[in-house]
């Protein structure tokens, strides 16, 4: 999947809770002058394979695979990178990999999180739940 986006004007502070297309949420917060984010909820709540709460089972680091997915940091050190764009590190819990990533403000209640590897970029739009 190839996704292209250009940074637009800066909107409201992107800190808050954001919902993805599957109903899960992340909590974006300040970490110094940067932005970070952690998983706040997942949907469905239980892993259908195990019947238990989701864990970080795809993590490349085997010692982290049994940790609860809720609370896992998914955005790190996101620094301002032009009008409404923040760039840093993205952890993809579906693949257990870390990539260069961006948080792009699309509007006051909409952001796009995207990551790139080997020149291919993909991402997802999220909607604001709580500021």
How does the language model describe each region?
Residues 5-7:
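N-terminal signal peptide c-region/cleavage motif recognized by signal peptidases
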Residues 9-17, 121:
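N-terminal helix-cap/turn-to-beta initiation motif at the start of protein domains
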Residues 15, 20-92, 98-101:
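Central antiparallel beta-sheet cores of small beta-barrel/beta-sandwich binding domains
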Residues 31, 106-107:
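Structural motif
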Residues 82, 107-109:
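Residue-level recognition of beta-strand termini and adjacent short loop/turns
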Residues 100-103, 110-124:
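Short, exposed beta-strand-loop hairpins at the edges of beta-sheets
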Residues 127-131:
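Short beta-strand-to-coil "C-cap" segments at the C-terminal boundary of structured domains/repeats
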């Amino acid at each position: 999947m190839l996704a292209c986006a250009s940074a637009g004007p800066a909107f409201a502070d992107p800190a808050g809770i954001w919902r993805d297309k599957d109903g899960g949420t992340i909590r974006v917060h300040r970490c110094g002058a940067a932005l970070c984010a952690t998983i706040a909820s997942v949907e469905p709540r239980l892993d259908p394979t195990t019947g238990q709460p989701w864990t970080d089972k795809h993590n490349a680091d085997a010692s982290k695979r049994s940790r609860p997915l809720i609370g896992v940091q998914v955005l790190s050190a996101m620094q301002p990178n032009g009008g409404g764009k923040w760039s840093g590190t993205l952890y993809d819990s579906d693949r257990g990999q870390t990539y260069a990533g961006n948080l792009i403000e699309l509007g006051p209640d909409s952001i796009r999180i995207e990551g790139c590897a080997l020149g291919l970029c993909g991402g997802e739009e999220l909607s604001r739940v709580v500021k």
